[in-house]
Curated annotation (Swiss-Prot):
Chief location bin: cytoplasm
Protein name as catalogued: Chromosomal replication initiator protein DnaA
InterPro entries: AAA+_ATPase, Chromosome_initiator_DnaA, Chromosome_initiator_DnaA-like, Chromosome_initiator_DnaA_CS, DnaA_C, DnaA_dom, DnaA_N_dom, DnaA_N_sf
Keyword ATP-binding: yes
Organism: Oenococcus oeni (strain ATCC BAA-331 / PSU-1)
Family: Belongs to the DnaA family.
Length: 450
């Protein structure tokens, strides 16, 4: 594959996937997921990574993540790449700074650059995302008007972040002076903690309120965190009342996020919410054709059809297979049906299977030395209730199963019972280190079995 075919986003997703499979969930969420790959220097084989703060930077140094990055990079690209990690911050309240430079505050907020590859031009519209795309385009052209807030929800790997950042890129194209801020929910919470420690909460609030467009990824991470929910509620109200735009992504609808304050649920739903579903075959084929045009290589329709037929999970895996295919071209091997089939066979061996509810129930039951019948039955004694709630929590965090369906899997319990159980575990792991470690170990064990 020629260097011009290199897809940084797919490359980084492949590395993140290997980190996720080989470390604890909490460590991954704290130290790997918040990092963004923004630039590749193919001549020197380096990749520029953005970290949201110094704490993440220190974790990379202490955790030997650089060496792991290089190992996983070779797995993904069959070549050596070295990461260059930088902390990206922006001085608070950019509007005031441009005018008079009045603020001498030490407060800085996370400010990621928008991914320039995430545009409407590189987005493929299909039945699975048509409504969400229509709303996103409308918001990019007239922010703060009809759809405010706009919530885009759906399972991981379907393109929520791409569509959300496309809104930001389009608005900057139409209004170059517009202030657009993209953050993850974890970034927001980290910034708030830093502001409190530095006694700069007023600057924190000003920084987040003085925007034309606020893009917030993974809003479900607010679950069970009342203190952060209150602050986000206040900022949310200020932005929407000023007729500025908020766009959010989530795995599920707000009403299905356990531990989310009713006021926030109401506010989040005052605009519109559209889901992105798994792409159908025509959309998957169109995505592959779009990618081949993007990297400038010709792949016959039969080969693309084979890939589109066999990978029906999500866009991320589809692009991963395509990227592997183009890597073969870099090695001088032909891109054809035969080689595509070999790639798919390899992916079928290495790709994780779907985690099922029975898998989780059995793993938890074995770990706590209780029977499956007791775990899903009516017993309410403490030695049964805790593992039952742990199982519910793991199902909620490791799968896309809705609360009602989880309730059905536990003897037909009501969804509010499931919500209470998952909220209780989320609260407990904030203070009970032993339980937190046990759940992380269970999560790792479940993923390894799947």
């Amino acid at each position: 594959m020629k260097d011009s075919y290199f897809d940084l986003n797919t490359f980084w997703k492949g590395i993140q996937g290997r980190f996720a499979a080989n470390m604890g969930e909490t460590a991954y969420e704290n130290w790997i997921k918040p990092v963004r790959a923004v630039k590749v220097d193919l001549a020197n084989r380096t990749v520029e990574l953005q970290a949201p703060n110094d704490i993440v930077m220190q974790a990379w140094d202490n955790g030997n993540y650089t060496a792991k990055f290089m190992e996983y990079a070779y797995d993904v690209a069959h070549d050596f790449f070295k990461p260059e990690l930088k902390v990206i911050k922006v001085v608070a309240n950019p509007v005031n700074n441009q005018k008079s430079n009045q603020s001498n505050s030490d407060f800085v907020a996370t400010d990621y650059q928008l991914n320039q590859n995430f545009t409407f031009d590189t987005w493929v519209i299909g039945d699975a995302n048509e409504l969400a795309t229509s709303a996103a385009m409308a918001v990019s052209e007239q922010p703060g008007r009809q759809y405010n807030p706009l919530l885009i929800y759906g399972s991981s790997g379907l393109g929520k972040t791409h569509l959300m950042e496309a809104i930001g890129n389009r608005l900057k194209e139409l209004q170059p002076d517009a202030i657009v801020r993209y953050i993850t929910t974890d970034d927001f919470m980290n910034d708030w903690v830093n502001a409190i420690s530095k006694k700069t909460t007023a600057d924190f609030t000003s920084t987040y309120e003085n925007v034309d467009l606020l893009l917030v990824d993974d809003i479900q991470m607010l679950q069970g965190k009342d203190r952060f929910q209150e602050e986000f509620f206040n900022i949310f109200n200020k932005i929407t009342k000023s007729q500025k735009q908020i766009v959010m992504t989530s795995d599920v609808l707000p009403k299905d996020i356990p531990g989310l304050n009713a006021r926030l649920v109401s506010r989040f739903m005052q605009g519109v919410a559209y889901d992105i579903q798994k792409p159908d075959f025509p959309t998957r084929l169109a995505i592959l054709k779009n990618k081949s045009e993007e990297v400038g290589i010709s792949i016959d329709n039969q080969t693309l059809t084979l890939i589109a037929e066999q990978i029906d999970t999500n866009v991320r895996e589809l692009e991963g297979a395509f990227n592997t295919l183009t890597l073969m071209a870099r090695a001088g091997r032909p891109i054809n049906v035969s080689n595509a089939q070999k790639i798919l066979e390899h992916l079928n061996i290495t790709r994780q299977k779907v985690i099922t509810l029975p898998d989780i129930q059995k793993t938890v039951a074995d770990d706590y030395n209780v029977s499956i019948n007791d775990l899903i039955g009516k017993k309410r004694n403490s030695d049964i209730v805790l593992p039952r709630q742990v199982a519910m929590y793991l199902i909620r965090t490791l799968t896309d199963t809705s609360l009602p369906k989880i309730g059905q899997a536990f003897g037909g319990r009501d969804h509010t019972t499931v919500m209470h159980g998952t909220e209780k575990i989320a609260d407990l792991i904030e203070t009970d280190y032993a339980l937190k470690q046990r759940i992380e170990n269970l999560s790792t064990k479940i993923k390894e079995k799947s």
